[in-house]
Amino acid sequence: MKNMLLMSGSKYKDTAYLVHTLPWLAQFLADYKGKKVAFVPYAGVRRSFDEYETTVKNALQSLELEIVSVHRGKQHRDIIEQADVIAIGGGNTFCLLKQMYEHDLLDAIRAKVNSGTPYFGWSAGANVAGSSIMTTNDMPITYPPSFNALNLFPHQINPHFISGKMQGHNGESREERLEEFLIVNPQSLVYAMPEGTALHIQGEQATVLGAQDILCFSEKMQLDTKAVNSTFNY
């Protein structure tokens, strides 16, 4: 059974890196102390893989996990196949997915997660769990072979969702961007995840975690609000 924790971002309000996620992760990984976590660092454009690995290790030290970045393997895929848990960090979703294709990780991750290996990711790491990355917020844009992602959660995800416009901002709001996406892709569902929220996926059900509701948009911007602590079939 699929077991995934998809988190909107690495911070919430003024919290330090990944601090607000620790209670979720402690429960999610309660049976995995001392186990090996394969960490995918490809989204970290402004830091090296070594630096990203160290940052995550330090942030999650209290969970007592063995975190190993996939770049430590002769073949990056080897680390995935040896892992007890898979984690994908945030950053640039285009760079992340491009390198996942280059290192042939998508099928390996899908197979592991579909057979029950826990998966957690934040920001870009949540985005790639969805059907495609076409509702990412990111620049720079690089070109993966396809925008199709892991499709472990078979809908679109928009992390870091913020409603409305800042005063003086004359560009499109996030709602307007998603409306445009749904005009072009009317059969899609988009799960808009505000800061401080997460989806815990267990099999074919999802539970909303965090401080705010998650918004599900469909054709013509029809809204289905997924309330905090609610569980729904997706």
Swiss-Prot record:
GO cellular-component term (any): cytoplasm
Cell compartment(s), UniProt: Cytoplasm
Classification via InterPro entries: Class_I_gatase-like, Peptidase_S51, Peptidase_S51_dipeptidase-E
Reaction equations catalysed: Dipeptidase E catalyzes the hydrolysis of dipeptides Asp-|-Xaa. It does not act on peptides with N-terminal Glu, Asn or Gln, nor does it cleave isoaspartyl peptides
Residues forming the catalytic site: S123, D138, H160
Gene3D superfamilies attached to this UniProt entry: 3.40.50.880
Entry-linked CDD domains: GAT1_Peptidase_E
EC number: 3.4.13.21
Gene Ontology BP terms: proteolysis
GO molecular function: dipeptidase activity; serine-type peptidase activity
Role description: Hydrolyzes dipeptides containing N-terminal aspartate residues. May play a role in allowing the cell to use peptide aspartate to spare carbon otherwise required for the synthesis of the aspartate family of amino acids.
Family: Belongs to the peptidase S51 family.
Descriptive protein name: Peptidase E
Organism: Actinobacillus pleuropneumoniae serotype 5b (strain L20)
